[in-house]
A protein has these predicted regions:
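Low-complexity intrinsically disordered segments
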Residues: 32-98
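A short beta-strand micro-motif
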Residues: 3-8
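Short, flexible N-terminal segments of the mature chain
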Residues: 13-41
């Protein structure tokens, strides 16, 4: 199961540029495979990315299919922000306001 970062108040999911197993860069959901690893590394990762208030983020568990559909909705573009409702268990994307 993938474990992802969610902002507690806004329900935003942490997205960034990643590299797939083919060595290709893509824009998607930052994830860990193991819960223990996610819990241990999340805070330091957020700090390394200069995220303000890393304490406002939590690790949540997703189904693999939920992560896949969320990455598709991001359209490999950083102009989209991803939000996740634990009630509906569906992703919502919003265009980044500049």
């Amino acid at each position: 199961m993938p474990y992802v970062l969610q902002q507690k108040e806004t329900e935003q999911i942490y997205t960034t540029t990643l590299v797939n197993h083919y060595g290709l860069a893509y824009y998607g959901v930052k994830f860990w495979i193991e819960q223990e690893e996610a819990n241990e590394q999340a805070y330091a990762y957020l700090e390394s990315q200069a995220v303000q208030d890393p304490d406002s983020w939590q690790v949540i568990e997703w189904e693999e299919s939920e992560m896949k559909i969320s990455n598709v909705k991001l359209k490999n573009s950083s102009v989209w922000q991803l939000f996740w409702s634990g009630i509906t268990r569906k992703p919502e994307v919003r265009k980044l306001e500049i």
